[in-house]
């Protein structure tokens, strides 16, 4: 066995790997001790020897002068001259012992002016610790302890924010310098890099769009009670160390160390020992109290080292808890925004997407009502709470923006193509909703996500894709009763923040899956249950991502600026505008737990164009290869009017620009007056609109087919 093998065997025997870092710290400390001792020991011994010899010489000379003064007859008879000679001797003694400056500092004006006190406070939270001035009273030392413990973390956070701002400014200056350099050189390489960055930017925008989400594969990860991803379960089980226990451990260690200091230092009291220990572990080190027992300095150093580790642990736990609290508040606010967005865009899942005009029209109507809401009188403490909530919200949003900027910078150095998106499905998020002949199990929140994602395709100025949606959500929030709790005020300030739109553009929204089931009445409805307890299905199911089911639809009624049709999305003034194609294919399933059958694709029959009263007849339907009995019954019930007089262009409905508002006296009706105060306008304030074409909702024929089926049976 070689020498290296023996050393390696011995290290494994004593388990050196578990505490080698501590040994390295001790070795580094010993190296520093040797280094400083080498250069300071001899010089300090010489300086102390000179000081001792000088002190002995001064003492001997002072004694000789006193003897001369006592023997001198002139000085014996003249008391004033004798006093003056004695004062000169004392001054000479103080100058020789270098005590004049120290006496002058103690006898001058107090250093505890406003500027001096601010200088001392700055020494504490910056951990500089010049040692002048220092506190001498017990009250001042107690204030020093708490001020330093609270000020040091705050100052570190301030330095972090300032460093991030300076780093961003330096980065912008560097980009500008590189840009100017590229413009001056105008080389092909710089042009290629510029085009590459632009293409990458356009690629990211395409990914966030509706078409990009269709093209990217989406892998569905299943979650259920007691069954989830192992990494997520491990992350959930990792609980941080309790902060109260850490603080109790720190307090116990401070008391124990202070007691040991009182034993080793006879002149110290317990309060002074606590003050010295806390000032030491906070790395301030004012130097107003020193050890008088050099033999115990090593043990004192070990006590301070353990206390410093405990204090650092407490600071880290508190910082992590604050960061998690900020992240939790941000996630809850984003979730509320998504829920409110779902309420804004709630509609029938079988009806086509609303055009961008509906998104831009509705917020203005709601803003008119919101501006007439009377302001609530709030007191000083309520206003202070609003101000505090606003500051906390600004800090949360600013931190998220900085994190997103860092992530965007790091993404440029990673691979160019991103990994597939991962969507999560939970059992509690799925609901069942029916519409006529079809039944679908869909995720309720997926509509809000899909509608928010569709805003990127709306005809709104770039950089303000969420502006109209936020205006509508703000109007909804204003009508809610105001609460005085901090969370409600923070959410209100969250909506009012000007950077919220940018946050929504940069936040990766959670995508949930939609499971579509087509009911086939030709056979029995079979309900199967998975042996492992998964969800039952009806008919033939195919799992697909919510984002992947979105199809571009530019066919809508000609009344594009109608308030009723596009604000509420529930009235249709034209025949149903589904894509006029024979059939289309849903893409292949992505290994979802809901895809139980062996079919790779599912054929969806053609959507029929159903005539409405006052509308021209739709084009004749094409022959269907896959027609269910329900579709056949619907075709038999449809009777198209061939009268050429009604084959006219649909009459254009009144829009917001055609309405003339006028104020109508309401009399003494308090309800109408309150309604006008809240809404701004009432139906009585408008002229009677011209008669338009009658409207009706589409009857899917489901009840009729069920009645006919029961009759035939």
UniProtKB/Swiss-Prot annotation:
UniProt entry keywords in alphabetical sequence: Glycoprotein, Ion channel, Ion transport, Membrane, Potassium, Potassium channel, Potassium transport, Transmembrane, Transmembrane helix, Transport
GO molecular function: outward rectifier potassium channel activity; potassium ion leak channel activity
Membrane topology: Multi-pass membrane protein
Xref: SUPFAM superfamilies: Voltage-gated potassium channels
Cytoplasmic side: 1-15, 163-242, 319-713
Keyword Glycoprotein belongs to the record: yes
Biological processes, Gene Ontology terms: potassium ion transmembrane transport
Protein name: TWiK family of potassium channels protein 12
Organism of derivation: Caenorhabditis elegans
């Amino acid at each position: 066995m070689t020498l290296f093998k023996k050393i390696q065997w011995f290290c494994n025997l004593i388990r050196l790997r578990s505490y080698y870092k501590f040994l390295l710290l001790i070795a580094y400390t010993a190296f520093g001790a040797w280094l400083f001792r080498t250069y300071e020991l001899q010089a300090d011994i010489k300086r102390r020897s000179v000081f001792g010899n000088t002190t002995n010489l001064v003492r001997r000379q002072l004694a000789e002068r006193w003897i001369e003064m006592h023997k001198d007859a002139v000085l014996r008879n003249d008391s004033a001259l004798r006093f003056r000679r004695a004062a000169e001797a004392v001054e000479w003694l103080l100058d020789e012992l270098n005590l004049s400056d120290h006496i002058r500092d103690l006898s001058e004006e107090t250093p505890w002016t406003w500027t001096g006190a601010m200088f001392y406070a700055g020494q504490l939270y910056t951990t500089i610790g010049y040692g002048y001035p220092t506190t001498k009273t017990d009250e001042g030392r107690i204030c020093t302890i708490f001020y330093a413990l609270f000020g040091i973390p705050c100052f570190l956070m301030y330095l972090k924010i300032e460093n991030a701002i300076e780093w961003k400014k330096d980065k912008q200056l560097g980009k500008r310098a590189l840009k100017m350099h590229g413009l001056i050189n105008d080389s092909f390489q710089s042009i290629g890099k510029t085009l590459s960055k632009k293409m990458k930017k356009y690629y990211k925008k395409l990914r966030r769009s509706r078409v990009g989400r269709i093209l990217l594969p989406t892998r569905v990860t299943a979650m259920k009670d007691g069954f989830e991803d192992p990494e997520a379960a491990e992350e959930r089980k990792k609980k941080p160390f309790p902060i109260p226990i850490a603080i109790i451990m720190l307090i116990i260690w401070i008391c124990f160390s202070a007691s040991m200091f009182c034993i080793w230092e006879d002149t110290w009291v317990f309060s002074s020992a606590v003050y010295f220990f806390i000032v030491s572990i906070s790395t301030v080190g004012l130097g107003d109290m020193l050890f008088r027992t050099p033999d115990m300095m090593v043990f004192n150093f070990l006590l301070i080292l353990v206390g410093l580790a405990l204090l650092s642990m407490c600071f880290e736990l508190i910082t992590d808890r604050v960061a998690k609290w900020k992240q939790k508040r941000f996630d809850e606010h984003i979730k509320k925004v998504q829920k409110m967005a779902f309420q804004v865009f709630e509609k029938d899942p079988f009806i086509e997407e609303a055009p961008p005009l509906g998104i831009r029209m509705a917020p203005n109507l709601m803003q008119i009502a919101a501006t007439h809401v009377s302001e609530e009188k709030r007191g000083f403490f309520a206003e202070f709470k609003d101000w505090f909530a606003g500051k906390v919200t600004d800090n949360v949003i600013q931190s998220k923006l900085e994190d997103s900027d860092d992530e965007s910078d790091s993404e440029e150095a990673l691979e160019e193509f991103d990994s597939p998106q991962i969507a999560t499905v939970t059992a509690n998020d799925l609901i069942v909703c029916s519409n006529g002949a079809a039944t679908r199990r869909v995720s309720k929140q997926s509509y809000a996500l899909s509608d928010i994602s569709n805003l990127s395709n709306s005809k709104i100025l770039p950089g303000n894709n969420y502006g109209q949606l936020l205006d509508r959500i703000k109007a909804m929030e204003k009508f809610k009763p105001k609460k005085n709790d901090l969370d409600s005020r923070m959410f209100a300030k969250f909506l009012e923040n000007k950077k919220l739109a940018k946050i929504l553009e940069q936040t990766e929204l959670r995508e949930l899956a939609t499971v579509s089931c087509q009911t086939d009445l030709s056979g029995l409805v079979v309900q199967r249950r998975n042996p492992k307890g998964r969800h039952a299905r009806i008919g033939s199911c195919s799992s697909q991502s919510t984002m992947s089911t979105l199809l571009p639809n530019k066919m809508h009624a000609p009344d594009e600026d109608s308030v009723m049709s596009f604000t509420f999305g529930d009235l249709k003034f034209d025949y149903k505008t589904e894509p006029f194609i024979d059939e289309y294919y849903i893409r292949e399933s992505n290994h979802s737990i809901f895809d139980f059958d062996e079919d790779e694709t599912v054929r969806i029959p053609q959507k029929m164009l159903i005539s409405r009263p006052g509308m021209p007849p739709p084009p004749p339907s094409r022959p269907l290869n896959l027609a269910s009995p329900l579709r056949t019954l619907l075709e038999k019930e449809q009777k198209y009017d061939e009268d050429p007089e009604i084959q006219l262009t649909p009459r254009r409905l009144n829009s917001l620009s055609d309405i003339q508002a006028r104020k109508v006296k309401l009399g003494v009706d308090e309800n109408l007056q309150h309604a006008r105060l809240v809404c701004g306008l009432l139906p009585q304030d408008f002229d009677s609109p011209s008669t338009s074409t009658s409207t009706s909702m589409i009857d899917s024929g489901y009840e009729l087919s069920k009645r006919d089926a029961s009759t035939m049976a």
